[in-house]
């Protein structure tokens, strides 16, 4: 069995205690040592409740095991857990973050009554016809005509933008901002994008060349769109 001192190390901080748990120890060993250390370090009844932060290192634990740790620490109500931190993230969270950071390239025409919705940035090679809708949690790039509805940053990302080779939408939405057809030129515009202007507190239309100076990450797409 490992030396108990190597399983859990307690360090005092201005906010309370930090518990560093050996990532190689079994969970059973961790719980056993935790019970002993908590009893030994328990403040007296007339002393304030102590805040505890648990550091797991490169160890991932389930919600059930996390709850077991909390119960051991708070069993006598002399400690309160203010955080359980790990250097690792659950697989589902990692996949979701990867989805949000990737650009989805889709070749199709979004026709009237159709909805195309994706996580992350969308690069649509094709048109959005009147009555069609494209929705993305990130930015929207359209190598084609935007004649329907586009909604970027639908999770609330106000930094998202919508760019199209030809823009004459019935509606643009970015986060919770909405801009309708009367806000645009009646004949439509080429190589333009919609972005939230924080000074005017609304969606405005600007050229892709201007936007590329503000958002360096779109420069590659801007060149592709300009080159057709």
UniProtKB/Swiss-Prot annotation:
Signal sequence interval, chain numbering: none
Keyword Cell cycle set for record: yes
Keyword Transcription regulation among record annotations: no
Any one Gene Ontology BP term: division septum assembly
Function text: Cell division inhibitor that blocks the formation of polar Z ring septums. Rapidly oscillates between the poles of the cell to destabilize FtsZ filaments that have formed before they mature into polar Z rings. Prevents FtsZ polymerization.
Subunit-structure text: Interacts with MinD and FtsZ.
Protein name, UniProt field: Probable septum site-determining protein MinC
Biological source species: Oceanobacillus iheyensis (strain DSM 14371 / CIP 107618 / JCM 11309 / KCTC 3954 / HTE831)
